[in-house]
């Protein structure tokens, strides 16, 4: 009886405790699975819960920074001394220089430093807090703008490139990545052997020197550049930072910061594209001095071709430059070169004209003699290339001799033998030809020497002055 009672009691206790044992067994199995298959995931979740400062922090950043308790439309220390705002710049690249528009495009990091005690917060570790662009719309930030800028924007890939860092004592750092296109007043009087001085100017738009003091944070070291920054047509000689004051009659004096840089143009590109073709055209025009004076089409065509080529070079250079009201160095060189090419054409015109005049004189002197020796003057001049049959009025009556003059001249000029007649004919023709050749070639001969010498002297003077 007692044994039966104990058996019933043990069975009853077992039925009651069995769910708890199973539950404990399930918990143990679950823990083992977590330890084996999801061990890494569990650790990550535990770490995230431990490091989640947003949940650990008892208040929002608006409350921590007293955003709701202060009027951030007013500058820090309003009514007192001007707020100091330090600036430093890291130039990432100079993207382009446009001579036509007289501007440049620059990408850089702009950093502002100031102190706003309204943003101070307690911190045991003395660590700063970093925010993105959203907080900049709720607090006071310096209103820096770029003087003489045409276009500017803050990069927004993948979000707006704005970083705001607030320290416990109220010191604030604002960093932006900006691209600006600004004016650069260029002087092209020495182009393309020029050096340009450009500057980007920073200034507060609303706050004059009584409210905001703008200065370079680290002096001359506040401006930094990339080590291997370069341009296709310019060599960057110098980067420097400076400061000054700007006066506006209606609002007063403002602090202004300057980012100055000096650009020296690479001249080798223009030597290949402009100077060398111009020199070749001038030298090609000199070939005309060695071509026979009778080759009218060859010399005229060569002269016209060189003149048109020089005009094309001048037009191409002018199209890529702003329309300034003064001569540039390249204009001086191209126009003087064009003058040499043009003078070579004028030289042949003078040679051809003097040859024509001389041959007319010789024709008048030898017309009657040529008739006695049965030389057709019209054919002789046509062969020379200076006259045509239609240009000569051959009046037979004027060329005919009366019988008395003919007999008298015949008695004087008729040779005694055939050999003496041939000798006299050669002597007469050689004398006339020598006169024509001498009068014609004297200009070409001097031009072959004079043109190159003068052009070389011009080049020595030009490069000596501009280089």
From Swiss-Prot:
GO biological process, one term: chemical synaptic transmission
Keyword Cell membrane part of the UniProt annotation: yes
Subcellular location, record wording: Postsynaptic cell membrane; Cell membrane
An annotated GO cellular component: postsynaptic membrane
Membrane topology (Cytoplasmic): 288-299, 353-446
Family annotation (PROSITE patterns): NEUROTR_ION_CHANNEL
Spans within the Extracellular topological domain: 25-266, 321-331
Gene Ontology MF terms: GABA-A receptor activity; GABA-gated chloride ion channel activity
Chain residues that bind 4-aminobutanoate: 111, 175, 203
One Pfam family matching this protein: Neur_chan_memb
Highest taxon, organism lineage: Eukaryota
Enzymatic reactions: chloride(in) = chloride(out)
Membrane spanning stretches: 267-287, 300-320, 332-352, 447-467
Disulfide bridge positions per record: 184-198
Main location per the UniProt record: membrane
Domain comment, as recorded: GABAARs subunits share a common topological structure: a peptide sequence made up of a long extracellular N-terminal, four transmembrane domains, intracellular or cytoplasmic domain located between the third and the fourth transmembrane domains.
Purpose: Rho subunit of the pentameric ligand-gated chloride channels responsible for mediating the effects of gamma-aminobutyric acid (GABA), the major inhibitory neurotransmitter in the brain. Rho-containing GABA-gated chloride channels are a subclass of GABA(A) receptors (GABAARs) entirely composed of rho subunits, where GABA molecules bind at the rho intersubunit interfaces. When activated by GABA, rho-GABAARs selectively allow the flow of chloride anions across the cell membrane down their electrochemical gradient.
NCBIfam families found in the cross-reference section: LIC (TIGR00860)
Subunit comment: Three rho subunits (rho-1/GBRR1, rho-2/GBRR2 and rho-3/GBRR3) coassemble either to form functional homopentamers or heteropentamers. Forms a ternary complex with SQSTM1 and PRKCZ.
Assigned protein family: Belongs to the ligand-gated ion channel (TC 1.A.9) family. Gamma-aminobutyric acid receptor (TC 1.A.9.5) subfamily. GABRR3 sub-subfamily.
Name this polypeptide is given: Gamma-aminobutyric acid receptor subunit rho-3
Gene transcribed to yield this protein: GABRR3
